Amino acid sequence: MRRITVLGATGSIGQNTLNVVSRHPDDFQVFALTAHSQISAMAELCVKHNPQYAVMGSYNAAAELKALLGQQTSTQVMYGDQALAEVSSDAEVDVVMAAIVGAAGLSPTLAAIDAGKDVLLANKEALVMSGQLFIDHAQRSGARIIPVDSEHNAIFQCLPQAAQQQVGTMALAEHGIQYLLLTGSGGPFRDIPLEELPQQTPGAACNHPNWSMGRKISVDSATMLNKGLEYIEARWLFNCSRDQLKVVIHPQSVIHSMVQYTDGSVLAQMGEPDMRTPIAHSLGYPERLESGVAGLDFTQIAELTFKQPEAQRYPCLQLAIEACWEGQWATTALNAANEVAVAAFLQEQVGFTDIAKVCDSVLQSIQADEADSLETLLAIDKQARLAANKWLQEYAQ
């Protein structure tokens, strides 16, 4: 019986994780669930899974949850950053699903890493912001990182077993690997005329053709900044050089990523676009767990197509690739600027193509040395958010 903490339990990844966990009651026990402010959704999860602890983002949210639960469960309700760190690092916890969206997920995920847990990494921003620092912490503590993002999980599955034991430190060439190929659908706007991009609405951006995701990640998919963040994450997870990492658009989302070997072989992980598959893989690794996902019916796949992403259509992707090799300060600043810009777009304060403009402006304005501590990274994050908000204020005038 393995005890699990789910960070970001009310989100898409969190709920899919609990869906898989509930299929294996003899293998998993829910130790703690966390959420920011989704009180009613959290109450339902607490009643269903009866965690030992539930953590909310604020005192008021915790008080409301406690009142709503009443005597229905024995769950102890807590709130705040310290409580997040505690349920991530508690001695009773075996596995932590790191699924808090955004920079807010970094600190509790690092707490789990420092405590030597098995960390199922679904939070892109942890590696985007902290990169080498994150990997160094895992090396020191002996924590095991298993990627959950469909693309990184796909690559992980296609690696030799020896490389799977060296997340963050592997030498790809020593394992006969030429390069890694990240696939992306291209989002809902991949085929519309470029001149129509500025008019696209939040509703259209969130209408992903293949995947069911949260609103923020759906917008990131539309700009392909999501793929840019995954590119940065892959650089750190698999210790890539620039020529060992490529991105290709694959509209059908059947192949989730590929590994090109030096002998000419290509290994690809395929499956239905359902996050329960990589979640089940990460939960069960190295064994396989039933996930509830139907197998692929190859007779129903009409075609598998691929193309290069257009720089004009996806400027956010290009910004992310350049930031990846510029330094940790750049990826941290880009992530922060994007979070601010996407939030403004979802509130219809800026247009779709303004997201890239905000990100580019912030990267141009920030002067930073290499980030070598969590405090420095958080300071850069704050500086970038201030710069992004300044851009938005000037835009509104």
Curated annotation (Swiss-Prot):
The reply on keyword Electron transport is no
Binding locations of 1-deoxy-D-xylulose 5-phosphate: 124, 150-151, 185, 208, 221, 226-227, 230
Which top-level enzyme class is recorded in the Swiss-Prot or TrEMBL entry? Answer: oxidoreductase
Task: Report the SUPFAM superfamilies cross-referenced here.
Answer: 1-deoxy-D-xylulose-5-phosphate reductoisomerase, C-terminal domain, Glyceraldehyde-3-phosphate dehydrogenase-like, C-terminal domain, NAD(P)-binding Rossmann-fold domains
Needed cofactors: Mg(2+); Mn(2+)
List the catalytic activities from the record. Answer: 2-C-methyl-D-erythritol 4-phosphate + NADP(+) = 1-deoxy-D-xylulose 5-phosphate + NADPH + H(+)
GO BP field = isopentenyl diphosphate biosynthetic process, methylerythritol 4-phosphate pathway involved in terpenoid biosynthetic process
Q: Which InterPro entries does the entry link to?
A: DXP_reductoisomerase (IPR003821), DXP_reductoisomerase_C (IPR013644), DXP_reductoisomerase_N (IPR013512), DXPR_C (IPR026877), DXPR_C_sf (IPR036169), NAD(P)-bd_dom_sf (IPR036291)
Residues that hold Mn(2+) according to the record: 149, 151, 230
- Mention one GO molecular function: 1-deoxy-D-xylulose-5-phosphate reductoisomerase activity
Q: Which UniProt keywords apply?
A: Isoprene biosynthesis, Manganese, Metal-binding, NADP, Oxidoreductase
HAMAP family reported in the protein's UniProt record? DXP_reductoisom
Functional description taken from the UniProt entry: Catalyzes the NADPH-dependent rearrangement and reduction of 1-deoxy-D-xylulose-5-phosphate (DXP) to 2-C-methyl-D-erythritol 4-phosphate (MEP).
What family name appears in the similarity comment? Belongs to the DXR family.
Recorded protein name is 1-deoxy-D-xylulose 5-phosphate reductoisomerase
Q: What is the lineage of its organism?
A: Bacteria, Pseudomonadati, Pseudomonadota, Gammaproteobacteria, Alteromonadales
